[in-house]
């Protein structure tokens, strides 16, 4: 049963609908929709090491977290396009109950149905265990498998809520966007979506299989377990904490070339791998050129770390920044020195130079390359560069309220206008009003829409980044 939304009086909502169920480290199974149940409270979030208040979950956290929220306009007269939001949080935190996962703002336009999903996080969703076989044979990218299952559920049941299963736009932020672009290399997801709008996430930064297996081994040793079977009964919070103990404490180091982190595993060559190709290669091949894309980045993505946890990520010297580029990112030293100079070496602090480098290396570069590759293959792709607004620096996450059609608390008028542009962009994209969007990227021409205050022109900066990073991989 639906209930009126508390923010918008023309929106109905169904909260905490179970879409799947799974035992620990097992492949989830679909749960049929029960239309007569009460859906007045958001379902539990995945277990995580986050302040529960941040999640706004009515039912706290649980391993049994596979639920979704649906919002629909009152009195839907015809089948509407559907926008599905996949939350971010580095595959370790977040929920569909956060304010920045609440699609009621987009739905209040009367133009779309909104869905926001939960999936398993941290060790429970992304620890690679398939190498142990037996009960763990399917334990590869379980969180991604959860997302695919949610899309199957939506395809089967969204018509009951006024949604058109043949008009599905997936969107998300950060880890959510990395995940949705990865679906291009997951054949099981084919036909379950029509458009992808990726905000600050790309077909990149995959966990190499060697590290995924090493991480599992280190977790077992940290927990002093003698058999993988013991993972099935160990305290789940202890398991999640063990992963944190193993990963680099300097979070920026997790984004270097080898991606020593937890997240989507490049499991293409594993026996029960979910990915059947490298997603960036799929984009380049044109196999999914029929899927329209939006790809975005902000002008100061990694500066969030300098502003919020400077002691954790401060390299202290420019030499340390350059050495990191050379040894951890495999950039030739002369090229690394040129990149450091471009990022402010000699004029700014080593910390700011480092965060500018990671903004370009982990965000700007893959955004440009993937937009170019999709256009070259004959696909339609819109590229957006988000700058700061008054009271809202263009850090990673600055656009999250705009994506879902909500207003950030205490937002300036400039931020509200910028975020409203993002909301309207997503609505026009999902409803096929391409005439209301800017020009897509062309085969041999960079086209980037700039919004917010501009520290640079997007196209000019993109040309500089492509030249500086020429020949440098960012898988």
Name the predicted role of every residue range.
Residues 1-141, 165, 299, 409-424, ...:
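Non-catalytic accessory segments of hydrolases
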Residues 17, 358, 362-475:
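Mobile gating loops/cap/lid regions near enzyme active sites that modulate substrate access
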Residues 65, 137-159, 217:
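Alpha/beta-hydrolase active-site loop
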Residues 81, 154, 161-173:
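Alpha/beta-hydrolase fold nucleophile elbow
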Residues 88-89, 142-146, 174-177:
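Active-site loop->helix "elbow" adjoining a glycine-rich segment at hydrolase catalytic centers
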Residues 156, 190, 199-317, 355, ...:
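Substrate-access "cap/lid" subdomains that shape
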Residues 165, 172-175, 187, 200:
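Catalytic nucleophile serine of serine hydrolases
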Residues 177-189:
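Short glycine-enriched nucleophile-adjacent loop
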């Amino acid at each position: 049963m639906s209930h009126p939304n508390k923010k918008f009086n023309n929106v109905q909502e169904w909260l905490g609908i179970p879409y799947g169920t799974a035992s620990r480290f097992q492949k989830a199974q679909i749960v049929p929709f029960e239309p007569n149940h009460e859906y007045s409270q958001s379902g539990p979030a995945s277990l995580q090491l986050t302040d529960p208040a941040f999640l706004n979950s009515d039912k706290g956290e649980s391993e049994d977290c596979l639920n979704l929220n649906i919002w629909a306009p009152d009195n839907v007269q015809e089948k509407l396009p559907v926008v599905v939001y996949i939350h971010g949080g580095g595959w370790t935190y977040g929920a569909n109950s956060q304010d920045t996962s609440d699609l009621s703002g987009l739905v209040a336009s009367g133009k779309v149905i909104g869905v926001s999903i939960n999936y398993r996080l941290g060790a429970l969703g992304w620890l690679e265990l398939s190498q142990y076989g037996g009960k763990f044979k399917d334990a590869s990218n379980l969180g991604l498998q959860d997302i695919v299952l949610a899309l199957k559920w939506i395809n089967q049941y969204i018509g009951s809520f006024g949604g058109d299963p043949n008009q599905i736009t997936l969107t998300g932020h950060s880890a959510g966007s990395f995940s949705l672009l990865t679906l291009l290399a997951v054949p099981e997801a084919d036909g379950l979506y029509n458009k992808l709008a990726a905000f600050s996430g790309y077909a990149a930064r995959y966990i190499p299989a060697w590290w995924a297996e090493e991480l599992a081994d280190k977790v077992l040793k940290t927990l002093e377990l003698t058999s993988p079977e013991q993972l099935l009964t160990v305290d789940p919070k202890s398991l999640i904490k063990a992963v944190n103990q193993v990963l680099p404490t300097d979070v920026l180091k997790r984004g270097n070339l080898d991606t020593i982190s937890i997240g989507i595993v490049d499991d293409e060559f594993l026996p029960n791998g979910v990915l059947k190709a490298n997603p960036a290669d799929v984009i380049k091949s044109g196999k999914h050129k029929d899927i329209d894309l939006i790809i975005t980045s902000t002008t100061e993505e990694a500066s969030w770390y300098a502003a919020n946890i400077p002691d954790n990520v401060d390299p202290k010297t420019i030499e340390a920044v350059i050495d990191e580029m050379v040894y951890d990112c495999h950039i030739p030293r002369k090229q690394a020195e040129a990149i450091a100079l471009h990022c402010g070496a000699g004029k700014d602090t080593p910390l700011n130079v480092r965060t500018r480098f990671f903004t370009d290396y982990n965000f700007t570069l893959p955004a440009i390359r993937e937009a170019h590759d999709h256009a070259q293959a004959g696909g339609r792709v819109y590229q957006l560069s988000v700058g700061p607004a008054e009271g809202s620096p263009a850090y990673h996450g600055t656009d999250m309220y705009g994506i879902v059609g909500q207003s950030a608390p205490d937002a300036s008028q400039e931020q509200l206008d910028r975020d409203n542009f993002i909301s309207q962009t997503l609505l026009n994209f999902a409803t096929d009003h391409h005439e209301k969007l800017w020009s897509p990227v062309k085969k041999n021409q960079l086209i980037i829409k700039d919004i917010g205050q501009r520290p640079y022109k997007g196209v000019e900066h993109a040309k500089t980044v492509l030249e500086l990073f020429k020949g440098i991989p960012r898988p």
